Amino acid sequence: MGNVVYKLTSKEIQSLMAQTTFETTKLPQGMKARTRYQNTVINIYSSGKVMFQGKNAEQVASQLLPDKQSTTGKHTSSNTTSIQYNHFHCIGSDEAGSGDYFGPLTVCAAYVSQSHIKILKELGVDDSKKLNDTKIVDLAEQLITFIPHSLLTLDNVKYNERQSLGWSQVKMKAVLHNEAIKNVIQKIEQDQLDYIVIDQFAKREVYQHYALSALPFPDKTKFETKGESKSLAIATASIISRYAFVKHMDHISKKLHMEIPKGASNKVDLIAAKVIQKYDIQQLDTISKKHFKNRDKAIHLINQKYNK
């Protein structure tokens, strides 16, 4: 039986618990929650550590915690040396919306040549994780005018259809990343491509298993954790994918005449309950990811209100 251990923040634990049902009562001292998911036991401890136990522990951990590396040292980047990607012509890919109950899953692949590096730094792309949504929108609307890219959006209806067919979020992301990358390759001179660098959400073998099609250039393809800090191509893709997610969320808010929050917090539960009350559960399902625990929590809030 394999064991994989992670150290998570409170926000990361909240996001993990939103993805499946956990037991939170009658637990041993020091344990916060536990569940069994795909024949893997998941224990969440008060210390912030999370343990996955089972034959497929690593694979399940990669699905539910795609952006984390384990403290057991088993989840490492596929790259053994540090590559200075900004000295090369690269396609980078990243996604947005995977941890948000409301809104779609958006994926972008973007091509950044060496000639783009100076202007991207001047625009502030290298600080992409520090940008608020307003700045993301302003910056992305400039980037899409001169950066070869492919932006794919999996709306909630299609997302929920695939999830009901047994697709994990990792599979959805692998398929979308691979398609976006292939789309960009068609837009550039292939001899002007040194690397394809993917913001790592799963190990290479897991990605290849789920992608449905082969990696376009396996020898040039790298997977990097915290990739936006290592590659301006990933940072650019991150901004454009986030831009698409933000614009879609704005559209949902206007359509429903209420502010729809990002994330998967308790505030999200309250707004989901309001959507059900104002419209119905079917409307909620068209703008959200059904398998997140927020849906059940919203229904519980409504039941509590009417059973008082």
Swiss-Prot record:
Q: InterPro entries attached here? A: RNase_HII/HIII, RNase_HII/HIII_dom, RNase_HIII, RNase_HIII_N, RNaseH-like_sf, RNaseH_sf, TBP_dom_sf
Q: What is its EC number?
A: 3.1.26.4
Q: Which GO terms describe its biological process?
A: DNA replication, removal of RNA primer; mismatch repair
UniProt: a divalent metal cation binding residues:
94-95, 199
| Residue span, RNase H type-2 domain | 88-304
Q: Which GO terms describe its molecular function?
A: magnesium ion binding; RNA binding; RNA-DNA hybrid ribonuclease activity
Q: How is the cofactor bound?
A: Manganese or magnesium. Binds 1 divalent metal ion per monomer in the absence of substrate. May bind a second metal ion after substrate binding.
Give a Pfam family name.
RNase_HII
Q: What class of enzyme is it?
A: hydrolase
Gene3D superfamilies this protein is in? Ribonuclease H-like superfamily/Ribonuclease H (3.30.420.10), TATA-Binding Protein (3.30.310.10)
Cofactors named for this entry: Mn(2+); Mg(2+)
Reaction(s) the record says it catalyses: Endonucleolytic cleavage to 5'-phosphomonoester
Q: Which UniProt keywords apply?
A: Cytoplasm, Endonuclease, Hydrolase, Magnesium, Metal-binding, Nuclease
Q: Which family does it belong to?
A: Belongs to the RNase HII family. RnhC subfamily.
**What the protein does?**
Endonuclease that specifically degrades the RNA of RNA-DNA hybrids.
Q: What is the name of this protein?
A: Ribonuclease HIII
